[in-house]
Amino acid sequence: MATRRQPLIPGWLIPGVSAATLVVAVALAAFLALWWNAPQGDWSAVWQDSYLWHVVRFSFWQAFLSALLSVVPAIFLARALYRRRFPGRLALLRLCVMTLILPVLVAVFGILSVYGRQGWLASLCQSLGLEWTFSPYGLQGILLAHVFFNLPMASRLLLQALENIPGEQRQLAAQLGMRGWHFFRFVEWPWLRRQIPPVAALIFMLCFASFATVLSLGGGPQATTIELAIYQALSYDYDPARAAMLALIQMVCCLGLVLLSQRLSKAIAPGTTLLQGWRDPDDRLHSRICDTVLIVLALLLLLPPLLAVIVDGVNRQLPEVLAQPVLWQALWTSLRIALAAGVLCVVLTMMLLWSSRELRARQKMLAGQALEMSGMLILAMPGIVLATGFFLLLNNTIGLPQSADGIVIFTNALMAIPYALKVLENPMRDITARYSMLCQSLGIEGWSRLKVVELRALKRPLAQALAFACVLSIGDFGVVALFGNDDFRTLPFYLYQQIGSYRSQDGAVTALILLLLCFLLFTVIEKLPGRNVKTD
């Protein structure tokens, strides 16, 4: 009797293996392109290059300071946000999340409008007869921008750790008379210290790979990071060998940081509590004053740059800028790239999670983790490094394309996969635990299960992942910086051209449009499932 031939790869494994192979192949192709173009021969001259080591040291130094200045204040701000309830608190917490996806050049424009030599604070000091000496360029400007982006995110993540503390622990501490330092040390710190290392590692990695911020606010050779040196080597000096060498160094550093971040990241289980929302009745005056001051300072950090973008964008150049076809061409380019990259990102992420879910269900935990880790691998290759690999690969083979839509879409989709994984990973596991036995008993599998179960139950997480991926793509500048030209420009690239040509009023209008587009796109996509969507 003939036996049925077994497939070489099970059908449920094909999606994840295909997506993982694609991601790894792209990373490997970019790496080989960099390696082949790196200078051959004696590497001793590389290690003796004083400017190279200055760039590497500055990259680490600014990332360390940025992480320190973001995490330490975030500890106290998170405690203040946990203890206080005030009008607009939910809006502030949402703003803390939105800073993560805010286009870098929009924030930079707002920071320059507030802290620049012709900015709001300079005008205020001049009216008071004082001299404004702060310059938003150089190391201090880079740190200011990084704190603007990362302090809110760190506060939000640490607030989650505080919310996981069981109410019984807080009540017992109050009954024992624990206040101030002792309460922080014995109750809050054990929960915070598990979250602080992974948060600090994440911020360090993001700041180490920062490109648009340093490009806009670096202010000269003394404030140059590895990514900016790569851009200069390709765009100004056209030295592919040096760019490849710098990209390899950047990739090795980022790979080490990714592995460190993964090692430090530990899931914190929520505390079991019957006293949800319990608050200490002994709410002292000085505690309320300190918390209020911290929250007001956080608002003064976040709101002025955003308000500056809105206020400066509504100027007399507004009708003229809106009438320019170039603006709408850039907007359409940004929109189509963002939507295509977002959809591709979510599809690849679901492919990885689908096969990973099946591997875990078959008790193959290590294989499932390896499949998910392939999606995180792209963090070791920042956008500018990946784009450099594509640039060298195409330049040495078929030549650079006239329109780089496909390259930018593909690169942005890959760069957003880690964020989409974080959004979809836990909901996917929850659905597996809830419906797996039922699907097996009913014989629902494959495409039928995806259509009947996953796509219905994951409507909200899928919309959120798509929104994050689209907005991250629409605000990206690192990849477009290498491939952008007068025939292919996105809104961030167009804004950078306006800033570089000192058309500040035109740039203000573009920054406002980009800001509104990001918030509108994020809100519309996130609301697509509807308020009363049923996930059962």
Please report, for each region that a protein language model flagged, where it lies by residue.
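Membrane-water interface segments at the C-terminal ends of transmembrane alpha-helices
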Residues: 7-41, 50-163, 191-216, 245-262, ...
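Short cytosolic juxtamembrane segments of multi-pass membrane proteins
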Residues: 270-281, 361-362, 528-536
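Short amphipathic alpha-helical coupling elements at transmembrane boundaries
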Residues: 45, 90-93, 126, 167-175, ...
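Juxtamembrane inter-helical linkers in multi-pass membrane proteins
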Residues: 171, 179-182, 268-282, 317-318, ...
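Glycine-rich helix-loop "coupling/hinge" segments at transmembrane-helix boundaries
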Residues: 113, 212-238, 476-504
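Flexible interhelical linker loops that connect adjacent transmembrane helices
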Residues: 4, 263-294
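Membrane-helix interface/capping residues of multi-pass secondary transporters
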Residues: 52, 169, 178, 211, ...
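Short helix-to-coil transition segments within interhelical loops
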Residues: 163-192, 359, 437-458
